[in-house]
């Protein structure tokens, strides 16, 4: 019988340069918490004619499952990853970000008396203004990223993620967290072991997309 991993890490990829995806993948494979699997969901990328991503996944097939489908956006891609993962806990990583080596073990230690956590990040920006994003409830107001619930910092039990779906709306991460609060025990924690590259050249945000809000009709 196949071993059930403790943690499933879900990563949706759409036209992210391979060197950035590789950095993200390697940050998962180099965790000090080894009992994990990585589910790569290729959201119909068109920039990988040489199949670098698939080939790299095959090199680490004991840890990585590769799924490809037609482009439908981050939320639906992560939802599909949830359906195809096996872990008792589920984590998310954006394809242009990375974990510090202790990130997942940090998250596991925070799960006492919680079913779902959202953590702060170490945020890397080009400009000071990039630390601020439009408020979900009032787009004329800006809030610091430390005060946001970021899609990729969510970490929780399998039950939370299989009970709820990410919606194709702006601030899908905050909406998910709010819906989870109605049924589960939640915590916002200060870890700083998730490296969040915001509006850096080559990142999702730099490619005219707002992280966590890709729409799919």
Residue ranges and their predicted role:
Residues 25-35:
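Short, acidic, metal-binding catalytic loop of nucleotide-sugar glycosyltransferases
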Residues 42-51, 94:
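A conserved acidic beta->alpha catalytic loop
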Residues 48, 97-110:
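Acidic donor-binding/catalytic loop of UDP-sugar-dependent glycosyltransferases
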Residues 69-85:
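Glycine-rich, basic loop-to-helix element that forms the pyrophosphate-binding segment
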Residues 104-131:
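Conserved donor NDP-sugar-binding/catalytic core segment of glycosyltransferases
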Residues 137-216:
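Conserved nucleotide-sugar donor-binding catalytic segment
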């Amino acid at each position: 019988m196949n071993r059930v991993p403790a943690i499933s890490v879900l990563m949706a990829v759409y036209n992210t340069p391979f060197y950035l995806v590789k950095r993200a993948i390697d940050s998962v494979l180099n965790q000090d918490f080894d009992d994990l699997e990585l589910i790569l969901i290729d959201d119909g990328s068109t920039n990988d004619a040489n199949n670098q991503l698939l080939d790299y996944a095959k090199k680490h097939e004991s840890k990585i499952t590769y799924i490809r489908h037609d482009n439908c956006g981050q939320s639906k891609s992560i939802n599909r990853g949830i359906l195809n993962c096996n872990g008792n806990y589920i984590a998310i990583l954006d394809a242009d970000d990375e974990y510090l080596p202790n990130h997942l073990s940090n998250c596991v230690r925070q799960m006492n008396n919680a079913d779902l956590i959202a953590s702060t990040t170490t945020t890397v920006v080009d400009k000071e203004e990039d630390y601020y994003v439009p408020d979900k409830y009032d787009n004329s107001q800006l809030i610091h990223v430390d005060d946001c619930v970021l899609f990729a910092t969510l970490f929780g039990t399998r039950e939370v993620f299989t009970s709820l779906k990410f919606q194709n709306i702006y601030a899908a991460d905050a909406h998910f967290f709010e819906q989870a609060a109605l049924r589960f025990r939640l915590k916002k924690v200060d870890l700083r072991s998730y490296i969040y590259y915001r509006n850096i050249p080559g990142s999702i945000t730099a490619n005219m997309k707002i992280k966590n809000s890709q729409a799919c009709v």
